[in-house]
Regions:
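Anionic-ligand binding patches
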Residues: 121, 129, 161-172
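Active-site HxH/HxHxD metal-binding segment of metal-dependent hydrolases
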Residues: 11, 26, 33-108, 125, ...
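Divalent metal-coordination and catalytic microenvironments
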Residues: 18, 30, 55, 67, ...
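Accessory terminal helices/loops
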Residues: 154-164, 173-251
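Core dinuclear metal-dependent hydrolase active-site scaffold
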Residues: 17, 96-122, 126-127, 158
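Conserved beta-strand hairpin/beta-sheet module of binuclear metal-dependent hydrolase folds
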Residues: 1-44, 118-130
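Active-site-adjacent loop/tail segments of enzyme domains
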Residues: 137-163
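Active-site metal-binding loops of divalent metal-dependent hydrolases
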Residues: 31-32, 56, 80-81, 112-113, ...
Length: 251
């Protein structure tokens, strides 16, 4: 069975090590802090053999060089990562990467950046989504368009609802405040927000999250909901997503 080791790094990033006991392989999912990844792997008794980058930002690929120098790990990611680090394999939507006998489908989730990808392991029921979607939020739209980003979120929405989403940042408390503003009559969201407050007060992580919960509470994944559309200008899903994203940027 695959093992996921999650740990905090930098200011608000999460690091992830994905380990396959059968093959002994370990993938670093993004590399916010190469030294911390190496420390975490050593503490687990694992050797990092692969790196899977989701996008090019330094808090996701900036640790590649340190890990490769220490381990010789093979680096996989979208072409845009070559802006700051070399890749052994360039991947895009529809490609498959493997860890031992486990297969991960590469999904185009562009919008935060133009080449952003996610890695979905259907047999394990997990997906590493980088900065495309967060618990109760989504990434800032630095490079993409509202249509592009909504199409990406729509692809995530089609995954099995029980899929566990590993998001790259602990932004959930702030996201919950905006979500309650955006969708104040959502009772399930209100309950989720109370749970988040309790977890953060106790110093607990709110990541990972489950897609089924996000489909019911995350306003950015619900831009196709008629009630939310009426509240945010009466437009279609793309227009509603754009309005929500602009409002969150200014919130």
């Amino acid at each position: 069975m695959l093992q996921v080791h999650q740990f905090p790094c930098l200011t608000d990033n999460y690091g992830f090590l994905l380990h396959d006991p059968a093959s002994g392989e370990t993938a670093a999912i993004d590399t916010p802090d190469g030294a911390e990844y190496l420390r975490q792997a050593q503490a687990k008794g694992w050797r990092i053999t692969q790196i899977w980058n989701t996008h090019w930002h330094p808090d996701h690929a900036g640790g590649n060089a340190a890990i490769v120098a220490a381990t010789g790990a093979r680096v996989t990611g979208p072409e845009e990562v070559t802006r700051i680090a070399p890749l052994d394999r360039v991947v895009a939507h529809g490609d498959v990467v493997t860890l031992g006998d486990w297969r991960a489908a590469v999904i185009d989730v562009s919008g935060h950046t133009n080449g952003h990808v996610a890695y979905h392991l259907p047999e394990a029921g997990i997906a590493f989504v980088g900065d495309s979607v967060f618990a109760l939020g989504c990434g800032r739209m630095f490079e993409g368009t509202p249509r592009q980003f909504w199409d990406s979120l729509s692809r995530i929405k089609t995954l099995p609802p029980e899929t566990v989403l590993y998001c790259a940042h602990e932004y959930t408390a702030a996201n919950a405040r905006f979500a309650r503003h955006a969708d104040p009559d959502n009772a399930e969201l209100a309950a989720y927000a109370r749970e988040i407050d309790a977890k953060r007060t106790a110093g607990e992580a709110t990541v990972p999250t489950r897609l089924s919960r996000e489909l019911a509470t995350n306003p950015f994944l619900r831009a196709d909901d008629a009630t939310l559309q009426a509240r945010w200008g009466g437009g279609d899903a793309v227009a509603t997503f754009a309005a929500l994203r602009a409002a969150k940027d200014a919130f």
